Amino acid sequence: MKRTYQPSNLVRKRRHGFRARMATKAGRKILNARRARGRKELSA
């Protein structure tokens, strides 16, 4: 059986990266929430 998680750095960056977050209103909201919490890393 094939596992569900097949790691790929390219797909990871495209889906969860900083620029992907900045591209949508909801994504920017996520970044602001993570900044407010004081997260060291904001995105993948």
From Swiss-Prot:
Species, as recorded: Ruegeria pomeroyi (strain ATCC 700808 / DSM 15171 / DSS-3)
Transport found in the keyword field: no
Record's protein name: Large ribosomal subunit protein bL34
Gene Ontology MF terms: structural constituent of ribosome
Keywords, alphabetical: Ribonucleoprotein, Ribosomal protein
Taxonomic lineage from the root: Bacteria, Pseudomonadati, Pseudomonadota, Alphaproteobacteria, Rhodobacterales
Family named by the database record: Belongs to the bacterial ribosomal protein bL34 family.
NCBIfam families named among the record's database cross-references: rpmH_bact (TIGR01030)
Pfam families tied to this protein: Ribosomal_L34 (PF00468)
GO cellular component: ribonucleoprotein complex; ribosome
Domain of life the protein comes from: Bacteria
Compositional bias annotation for Basic residues: 26-38
Keyword Ribonucleoprotein included in the entry's annotation: yes
GO BP terms: translation
Chain residue ranges for the region called Disordered: 25-44
Gene: rpmH
